Design a protein with these regions (language model features):
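Conserved G/P- and acidic residue-centered "switch" motifs that form tight phosphate/ATP-binding loops
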Residues: 32
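Hydrophobic, aromatic-enriched interface-forming segments
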Residues: 35-37
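Anionic-ligand binding region
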Residues: 48-75
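Catalytic beta-strand/loop cores that center a nucleophilic Ser/Cys/Thr
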Residues: 73-120
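Acyltransferase
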Residues: 127, 131-153
Length: 153
């Protein structure tokens, strides 16, 4: 994966939308680009290219190609009910410094941030992988969506 051209409509609008949802105490589930957007919009930053750090593959949409360790006592750990999960991956950027007010909830073996959340929000969870591509065969991944939908009710 590589950076595409900037989207002059999407790029400035999404951080505003995220902050508006959080201000209105609406649930947020941020996937892939979404975790990166959430972190930057709230004051964190990104690794622009993770290739120099790569020890595990980050370029397979469909396969479970690397292990993520989930921190205990986080929303993500309560949803998944396990300390490690196998995930897919399709990215070349990643969260570097986690934004103030967010907590780290998951890491890959090579130290890439795979999950962040905002504990003082109704539901605000970001994951770097694509649970939507794994949820049909993996109840833990489906649990992410079930928890999000429950928070939306």
């Amino acid at each position: 994966p590589a950076c595409g051209e900037p989207n002059v409509l999407r790029d400035p609008a999404e951080p505003l939308l995220l902050r508006a949802f959080l201000a209105a105490d609406k649930p947020v589930l941020a996937i892939c680009r979404g975790i990166q957007l959430m972190n930057v919009a709230l004051g964190g930053d990104l690794y622009q290219d993770i290739k120099p750090f790569e020890h595990v593959p980050h370029n397979d949409h469909w396969g479970k190609i690397h292990t993520v360790t989930v921190r205990r006592d986080t929303l993500l750990s309560r949803i998944l009910g396990q300390d490690t999960v196998l995930v897919n991956s399709q990215h070349h950027q990643a969260v570097d410094k986690v934004a103030p007010g967010l907590v780290l909830s998951a890491l890959s073996e090579d130290g890439i941030v795979e999950g962040i959340e905002k504990p003082d929000a109704k539901f605000c969870l970001g994951v770097q992988w694509h649970p939507e591509w794994l949820s049909a065969a993996d109840p833990a991944m489906q649990g992410i969506f079930d928890a999000f939908v429950a928070a939306c009710k």
